[in-house]
């Protein structure tokens, strides 16, 4: 992938965002006597599990108490988890991932209860701060890489089942923007709809069906906003011997990295997010805010992504320990 340099990572001026820098616990105000509620959508996948564990560890390291819930990827449970946290009157609530439409009313209740809301990879009008990767950079860089890798001409099979999830919405939007400058690159319609449970097998079946509909030369790449469906996609493509098709994802899931490291696999590239840093940064922002240092807490804390392809996968895995 065409990795941007650290000085080239843009932060939208209107967002109030900053590129987040990690601080030691000694530099962050104590959370002693404070209780922080944590509501995660799930801990099914590596990304959400690491963030969930890390934010709890950091709150406790800063002296705070944690009330942690995870919704097992069930939207209704995620809503009820947030509502149950409100009833326990914590000093702050951190929500990890979620669907904007489904969670909106519950987050409005958090706001009405006067409880500061913090989010991770989930934008909300009620959030004091959202910690996230720079999804505009992720989306545009992956899109440009695909377009260049297929020679500026061809057809892309797309998984687009999570339009209500902020990172996916942004990454897909950037794909559309980039392709405006590649008029010979088309998105295959109708787009595929990825699922959150049974993702790999479902995606594998959908791509198998697509391979039957579109013979060799009619699919050049497969795009998704995350890695899990792409593992199934790559399995289907590799089993069919369709080595003309390249697969691209986001999240640097271990299974995806293993496939990228395999020169025979169609899985071509992914993007690592700084999951440990995201959890730590969110807890630090809570501590700063509750201490009264509100001016030190931006609307959005952006963490720089790391782009991984077949050329650098081993090096990046060693450097990041993934």
Label every model-predicted segment:
Residues 1-322:
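A residue-level marker of the well-folded mature domains of exported/periplasmic proteins
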